């Protein structure tokens, strides 16, 4: 069982689920690759276990295995025949030379990929092995599926020596930002897999050149959109077909399938966001509210056409200025209190009561004026026929004029009634 192998298998499954797979896509195979496919890989197996089951299993998968149960003997053999070994598998718990010591020696003096194996899978053990340059970590018992693909470390080592970071990518092509980050991860992983450099060696032997980032110019993006439209729809567009159309029909050079795949994924996400309809906001917003019916009615009541000017609130009007018609009043329904800080009021009820009381006051004054004039006239006319003694002892004469705009019951207010006291209370 291999920790790295499980991670690689899981990542492969995730990629197959997320990215549409194009049939017929394969890495280019050159003559060197064909030679590697037919060639057997030479493996040095170092372990204290005398059981040869692992060796027999590796032999079934066409590995040429040389096995040692002593670390010192294995290291001596490796010093003399380092050019005849393609892969080293070393037990982490060897008594004389453990796995970390072997990684240190091989990393300084040789250029071989080293795989560490152990019966335990503690994180500390795995992390230490990786830090010292192990390209893989196997947990005993090792399955046949893991053994079957151990040759990938030898193949990756050959690619790193020939300067091929990834098949199918040109050194002059700019990489996407996401691809650039992935490339850094791959380079770090490959340097660990080489098993030939420790931590200090990695810092000293960094590659002086890095691939520049991919720049999708507006013109290049327009050609990309033309290619997508040519496919019929965004769902039918695949990186391989888009790249082929851009290279053959639009004469675009320097692009790779990974560049197009990354840009296509971002383009799909952007299209989904653009096509998603905006849901109406259900939350109440004051800006969307309709007109305030109460406030509109209050403004109507307080307008100069419907209400006398002395009934409109003034910020600095004294108590006695209610009857002053020449003072300009603001057309608002706010009362001034506490240093002219206004608050809203509902003046409808107050104005109705106040107008009714003023009407009563005017009617009473009109009645008093009419009554006084009539009484004066009767007194002058009837004083000639009525003796003075009779007038002194008789009750006051009450005369009602039917032409007045009020009834006889409304002539006199109740005893003790004062219109100005009523206005002050209200």
UniProtKB/Swiss-Prot annotation:
Where is the stretch described as Disordered?
Answer: 161-216
Q: How is it modified after translation?
A: Two-component system major event consists of a His-to-Asp phosphorelay between a sensor histidine kinase (HK) and a response regulator (RR). In plants, the His-to-Asp phosphorelay involves an additional intermediate named Histidine-containing phosphotransfer protein (HPt). This multistep phosphorelay consists of a His-Asp-His-Asp sequential transfer of a phosphate group between first a His and an Asp of the HK protein, followed by the transfer to a conserved His of the HPt protein and finally the transfer to an Asp in the receiver domain of the RR protein.
What Gene3D superfamilies does the record tag this protein with? 3.40.50.2300, Homeodomain-like
Q: Tell me which UniProt keywords the record has, alphabetically.
A: Activator, Cytokinin signaling pathway, DNA-binding, Nucleus, Phosphoprotein, Transcription, Transcription regulation, Two-component regulatory system
Q: Where in the cell is it found?
A: Nucleus
GO CC, alphabetical: nucleus
Q: Which GO terms describe its molecular function?
A: DNA-binding transcription factor activity; phosphorelay response regulator activity; transcription cis-regulatory region binding
User: Per the Swiss-Prot or TrEMBL record, what residue ranges does the short sequence motif Nuclear localization signal cover?
Assistant: 210-213
- The feature table lists the DNA-binding region at 213-268
> Per the UniProt entry, what are the Gene Ontology biological process annotations, in alphabetical order?
cytokinin-activated signaling pathway; embryo development ending in seed dormancy; regulation of DNA-templated transcription
- NCBIfam families in the record, alphabetically? myb_SHAQKYF (TIGR01557)
Task of the protein: Putative transcriptional activator that binds specifically to the DNA sequence 5'-[AG]GATT-3'. Functions as a response regulator involved in His-to-Asp phosphorelay signal transduction system. Phosphorylation of the Asp residue in the receiver domain activates the ability of the protein to promote the transcription of target genes. Could directly activate some type-A response regulators in response to cytokinins.
Subunit info here reads:
Binds the target DNA as a monomer.
Family in the record: Belongs to the ARR family. Type-B subfamily.
Q: What is this protein called?
A: Putative two-component response regulator ARR20
Q: Organism source for this protein?
A: Arabidopsis thaliana (Mouse-ear cress)
Gene it is expressed from: ARR20
């Amino acid at each position: 069982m291999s920790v790295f192998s499980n991670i690689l298998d899981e990542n492969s499954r995730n990629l197959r689920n997320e990215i549409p797979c194009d049939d017929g896509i394969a890495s280019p195979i050159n003559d060197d690759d064909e030679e590697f496919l037919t060639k057997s890989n030479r493996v040095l197996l170092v372990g204290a276990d005398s059981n040869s089951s692992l060796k027999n299993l590796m032999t079934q998968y066409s590995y040429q295995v040389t096995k040692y149960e002593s670390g010192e003997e294995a290291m001596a053999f490796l010093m003399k025949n380092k050019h005849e070994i393609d892969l080293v598998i070393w037990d982490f718990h060897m008594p004389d030379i453990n796995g970390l010591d072997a990684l240190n020696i091989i990393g300084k003096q040789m250029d071989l990929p080293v795989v560490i194996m152990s019966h335990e899978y503690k994180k500390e053990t795995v992390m230490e092995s990786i830090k010292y340059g192990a390209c893989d970590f196997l947990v005993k018992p090792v399955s046949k599926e893991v053994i079957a693909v151990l040759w990938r470390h030898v193949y990756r080592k050959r690619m790193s020596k020939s300067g091929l970071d990834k098949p199918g990518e040109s050194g002059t092509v700019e990489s996407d930002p996401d691809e650039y980050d992935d490339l850094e991860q791959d380079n770090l992983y490959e340097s660990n897999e080489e098993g030939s450099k420790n931590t200090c060696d990695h810092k000293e032997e960094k590659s002086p050149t890095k691939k520049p980032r991919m720049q999708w110019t507006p013109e290049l993006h327009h050609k990309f959109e033309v290619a997508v439209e040519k496919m019929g729809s965004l769902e039918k567009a695949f990186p391989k077909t888009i790249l082929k159309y851009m290279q053959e029909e639009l004469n675009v050079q320097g692009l790779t399938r990974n560049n197009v795949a990354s840009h296509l994924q971002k383009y799909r996400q952007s299209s989904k966001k653009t096509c998603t309809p905006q849901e109406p906001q259900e939350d109440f917003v004051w800006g969307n509210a309709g007109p305030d019916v109460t406030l509109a009615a209050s403004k109507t009541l307080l307008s100069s056409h419907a209400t006398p000017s002395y009934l409109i609130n003034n910020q600095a009007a004294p108590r006695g200025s209610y009857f002053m018609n020449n003072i300009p009043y603001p057309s608002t329904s706010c009362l001034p209190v506490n240093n002219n800080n206004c608050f809203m009021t509902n003046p409808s009820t107050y104005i109705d009561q106040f107008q009714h009381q003023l009407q009563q006051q005017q009617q009473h004054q009109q009645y008093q004026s009419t009554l006084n004039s009539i009484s004066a006239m009767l007194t002058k006319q009837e004083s000639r026929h009525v003796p003075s003694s009779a007038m002194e002892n008789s009750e006051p004469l009450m005369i009602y004029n039917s032409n007045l705009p009020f009834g006889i019951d409304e002539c006199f207010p109740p005893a003790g009634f004062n219109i100005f006291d009523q206005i002050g209370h209200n």
